[in-house]
Design a protein with these regions (language model features):
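Conserved structural position within tetratricopeptide repeats
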Residues: 30-33, 63-67
Length: 76
């Protein structure tokens, strides 16, 4: 199960680099279903949402990530 999540996140990260935020979001959404309280995955989902201009949803993801891990300075 962890490998599957790792693969989803790796694919999502590459898609963000490639600028395909819509497809990246689908990978991060799958990963969030598997680990809903993982602040790193929530942050990545927020990055994809921000790239799509869905700012309110992105802020929700960033805020939840910070609630789960207040030391996470990458949540932006």
């Amino acid at each position: 199960m962890e490998e599957n999540i790792s693969d989803l996140v790796k694919k999502g990260n590459q898609l963000i680099i490639d600028g395909d935020f819509e497809k990246a979001l689908s990978y991060f959404e799958q990963a969030v279903i598997m680990q809903p309280n993982n602040p790193d995955i929530l942050n990545k989902k927020g990055v994809a949402l921000r790239g799509l201009g869905r700012y309110d949803e992105a802020i929700e993801c960033f805020n939840k990530s910070l609630q789960l891990d207040p030391r996470d300075l990458d949540s932006s």
